[in-house]
A protein has these predicted regions:
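Hinge/beta->alpha junction and helix N-cap segments in small-molecule ligand-binding domains
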Residues: 29-42, 59-71, 92, 115, ...
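Flexible loop/hinge segments that line or gate small-molecule binding clefts
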Residues: 93-135, 146, 153, 159, ...
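Bacterial N-terminal signal peptides that target proteins for export
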Residues: 1-9
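Sec/Tat signal peptide C-region and signal peptidase I cleavage site
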Residues: 17-23
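Hydrophobic alpha-helical
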Residues: 79, 88-105, 173, 187, ...
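Bacterial N-terminal signal peptides
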Residues: 11-17
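Conserved small/polar residues in nucleotide/adenosyl-binding loops
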Residues: 276-282
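Short, polar/charged alpha-helical segment
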Residues: 38-55
């Protein structure tokens, strides 16, 4: 079976940073720092900010994507430090809204990345950048159908319910499957972006569904846990497995036949773009 790695590149528009007399802080706050994806965003942002003296960058995030309160506190702290701008990947579409509104009221420009905020925050941030997660979900669904056919049963292993990226990625995957095949879907199951949780969930799904033809993992830690469970169950190469993101573990699972395809975002390019999109203060 042909293995594949597909890239989902993020386009960006160049903005103009305000001219300041001394180095000012741009706070980059992501969903978690314990992820190869977000560390690549960090590397891209560091490369973008190197060689200039107007800005310094700080980079932080909670220990896990489910630690929403910690991320809210980080945004509040950045506001209290009177940073020049905030680049935020919200782990929850609603919980971060009050903090973003406070930043707006304080005259601090905010750029949202990766996952959208709820409509309640409309007008309180300057820009939004992300992978087209709906298009990515459709691409993954097309690949699944091409590999397993239009009949049978597949499972969906997701991460955090209600997050903007998850809604688009998993929602459009499921919608395309239902509209273009007769495949039945088991799940989605939510790992809370915890590898160990995904491993245990996938182990249970495989045991309860011996007739499963395919399985889709929707983000990096979920895919790694999913693939480890498949391998431990001795089902590598026996079940079609498609993942999202592309850290070293996932690439190795492609090589050994546990994963059949992964869809990779341009996380480094996202970070590289973002330092140029922080808008001027109001």
């Amino acid at each position: 079976m042909k293995k594949s790695l597909k890239a989902l590149m993020l386009g960006c528009a160049l903005g103009v940073l305000p001219t300041l007399a001394m180095a000012q802080e741009i706070a980059v706050i992501v969903k978690t720092t314990n992820s190869n994806y977000w560390q690549n965003v960090r590397k891209g942002a560091e490369a973008a900010i190197a060689g200039q003296s107007k800005y310094k960058m700080t980079f932080e995030g909670p220990a896990s994507e489910s630690a929403v309160a910690d991320e809210v506190n980080m945004v509040d702290a950045a506001i209290n430090r009177k940073v020049a701008g905030i680049i935020l990947a919200p782990s929850d579409p609603s919980a971060l809204v009050p903090a973003v509104k406070q930043a707006y009221d304080s005259g601090i420009p905010v750029v949202i990345i990766d996952s959208e905020l709820s409509k309640a925050a409309a007008g309180d941030y300057q820009s939004f950048f992300s992978t087209d997660n709906c298009a990515a979900g459709k691409m993954a669904a097309q690949e699944m159908i091409s590999l397993v056919g239009k009949q049978g049963k597949i499972a969906v292993m997701s991460y955090v319910p209600g997050v903007g990226s998850e809604i688009g990625r998993v929602g459009c995957f499921e919608k395309y499957i239902k509209s273009n095949s007769s495949l039945s879907i088991v799940g989605p199951y939510y790992s809370q972006s915890q590898m160990a949780t995904a491993l245990n969930q996938t182990t249970d799904v495989l045991a309860a569904n011996p007739d499963l033809k395919g399985i889709f993992g929707a983000n990096e830690p979920t895919v790694v846990g999913m693939a480890r469970a498949i391998k431990q169950a001795g089902k590598s190469g026996q079940i079609v497995a498609i993942g999202f993101d592309g850290n070293e573990d996932e690439q190795n699972f492609i090589k050994d036949g546990t994963l059949d395809a992964i869809f990779v975002q341009g996380s480094y390019q996202m970070g590289d773009c973002l330092l140029y999109t922080s808008p001027s203060p109001r």
